[in-house]
């Protein structure tokens, strides 16, 4: 009952998806396994995507992915085919999906963003903003050269902002405990849940200061509809961010198929009209 979306959606993983890389012919014998592996993932995604069988995408990226080859064009092509190529088209589609985009950006390893660094102390609170660098560097790198992150939908009705707002931080319970974010969790022989936020004797207000830094961050304020709720979903005891993803998957699952049919039927009607207009001059 807590995974209602599974009654409507099937899950298919495309691990390690990347865009194309360039190799010299003389190096083919050393890079062939990598080419085949990446080609297999790309082929499967493109095959399902072109047949309109991928209704939603959960794109997972970690906190330091800017050096990796990106798949911006692959994601953008899927958006154009399944949601819309303009803010107006996307708004029309999302009006039928409770305002939730079927593209989920999942910011994994968010526990790393929450970890205290060597330079974090009560005398330089302003520098805590560097914990959210992934939003200013990784995100634009992923989708470049496209600009839809800030021009996602036409405002009005369900949409109070034009910005893309379907981003979900996700952390790992084990590493949150291992690296001093929360205390109490164990997945060993004796299981236990998180008991408390880790407190530093020399900086007891660290986590509260970090929270305020998150809430005041310009990217967060623009791209999270409710920053306080997002923080509570991912950075409170025994909440790793997954419940927010499940909540919105549940909200979209029951209406997504009808919304897709409506969009594709409208596209077919447009094609029919254009063909009729083109041929009518000859008859």
Language model features: what each stretch is:
Residues 1-30, 278-283:
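Long, low-complexity, polar/charged, intrinsically disordered or flexibly structured peripheral segments
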Residues 37-57, 61-282:
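Conserved GTPase G-domain substructure that encodes guanine base recognition and part of the catalytic core
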Residues 19-47:
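Nucleic-acid-processing active sites and adjacent nucleic-acid-binding tracks
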């Amino acid at each position: 009952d807590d995974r209602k979306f599974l009654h409507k959606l099937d899950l298919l993983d495309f691990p390690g998806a990347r865009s194309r890389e360039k190799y010299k012919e003389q190096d083919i014998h050393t890079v062939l396994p990598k080419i085949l592996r990446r080609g297999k993932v790309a082929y499967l995604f493109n095959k399902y995507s072109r047949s309109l069988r991928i209704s939603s995408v959960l794109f997972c990226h970690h906190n330091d992915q800017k050096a990796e080859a990106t798949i911006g064009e692959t994601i953008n092509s899927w958006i154009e085919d399944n949601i819309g190529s303009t803010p107006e088209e996307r708004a029309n589609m999302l009006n039928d999906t409770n305002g939730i985009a079927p593209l989920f950006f999942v910011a994994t390893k968010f526990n790393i963003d929450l970890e205290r660094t060597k330079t974090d102390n009560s005398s330089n609170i302003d520098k805590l903003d560097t914990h959210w660098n992934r939003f200013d560097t990784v995100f634009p790198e992923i989708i470049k050269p496209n600009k839809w992150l800030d021009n996602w939908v036409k405002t009005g009705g369900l949409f109070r902002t034009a910005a893309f707002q379907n981003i979900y931080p996700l952390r790992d319970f084990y590493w949150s405990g291992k690296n001093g974010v929360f205390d109490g969790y164990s997945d060993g022989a004796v299981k236990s849940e998180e008991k408390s936020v880790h407190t530093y004797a020399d900086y007891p207000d660290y986590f509260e200061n970090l929270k305020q830094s998150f809430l005041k961050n310009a990217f967060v304020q623009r791209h999270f509809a409710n920053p306080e709720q997002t923080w509570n979903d991912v950075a409170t005891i025994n909440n790793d961010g997954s419940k927010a993803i499940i909540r919105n998957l549940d909200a979209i699952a029951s209406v997504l198929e009808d919304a897709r049919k409506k969009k594709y039927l409208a596209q077919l009607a447009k094609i029919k009209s254009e063909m009729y207009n083109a041929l009518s001059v000859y008859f």
